[in-house]
Amino acid sequence: MKKSLTSLDLNLLLCLQLLMQERSVTKAAKRMNVTPSAVSKSLAKLRAWFDDPLFVNTPLGLAPTPLMVSMEQSLADWMQMGNQLLDKPHHQTPRGLKFELAAESPLMMIMFNSLSQQIYQRYPQATIKVRNWDYDSLEAITRGEVDIGFTGRESHPRSRELLSLLPLAIDFEVLFSDLPWVWLREDHPALREAWDLDTFLRYPHISICWEQSDTWALDDVLQEMGRKRHIALSLPGFEQSLFMAAQPGHTLIATAPRYCQHYNQLHQLPLVARPLPFDAQQREKLMVPFTLLWHKRNSHNPKIVWLRQAINTLCRRLI
């Protein structure tokens, strides 16, 4: 008997499309920002609706049934038409449209020119406000003062900046992971020595004040080893620390994300990079997942969805 569309939750079709794309309940759940259990329940409802397994488990992931394969293109077309319909009022370049971003610098400086061009091309009358990521940026997202944040979090188990500790109201997407490097002036005396932990700790360090803290996971790892670095200078951000590390007349060294190589090239800073002198297990604790963050209420806001996609594409191209 033919079933009525009115009795089907249309969100199930989005779930079906993501399952077809990812061939994995876990990966589809991650893209939908729900639990794998929720996706499994949705799949059960879809199987009942279509009276077909739709997918079968294989060692390589979910394999679509013949019925699912036959529906793939129609489903994709239907979703595309739905997105175009929902985007229609936002594609009319409304007056007063405003983008509010909070981002880590120099990451935003690397990509902002390209991003702003894309925004103005799509929304010619839009205005853009960018603020530096700070200790209160998550609260600003929650209050609706910031549309989207773009910043690094931490991986050390004791860090207060783990992704798992984000407020429940915040959704996120990790765009890339970065292992920080040590940056030294190209004539720094450390470059004439064996590069090891003793050399790394022998010289004074530039640190940044990050969310009201002068220390980060690097200092936690050193503490676990019974060691400590001498922080001689604290600055507001990475661009200032890199600029100071490049200046003559001192032996200061800076630790900053690896992506900063693009910033250094852009500004022709005379810096040389060295890896952090730790073993693989210690480096794992120092990985920085660079992450887009937004409030759950904006998860399906066409403006925010488009902005996330634009930043994602730029990161893949530039970083």
Curated annotation (Swiss-Prot):
Keywords in alphabetical order: DNA-binding, Transcription, Transcription regulation
UniProt domain HTH lysR-type: residue ranges: 8-65
InterPro entries (alphabetical): LysR-type_TF, LysR_subst-bd, Tscrpt_reg_HTH_LysR, Tscrpt_reg_YidZ, WH-like_DNA-bd_sf, WH_DNA-bd_sf, YidZ_PBP2
Pfam families: HTH_1 (PF00126), LysR_substrate (PF03466)
Annotated coiled-coil segments of the chain: none
Top-level taxon in the UniProt lineage: Bacteria
GO molecular function, one term: DNA binding
Family recorded in the similarity comment: Belongs to the LysR transcriptional regulatory family.
Function of the protein: Involved in anaerobic NO protection.
NCBIfam families: PRK10216.1
Protein name, UniProt field: HTH-type transcriptional regulator YidZ
Naturally occurring in which organism (per UniProt): Salmonella heidelberg (strain SL476)
Taxonomic lineage of the native organism: Bacteria, Pseudomonadati, Pseudomonadota, Gammaproteobacteria, Enterobacterales
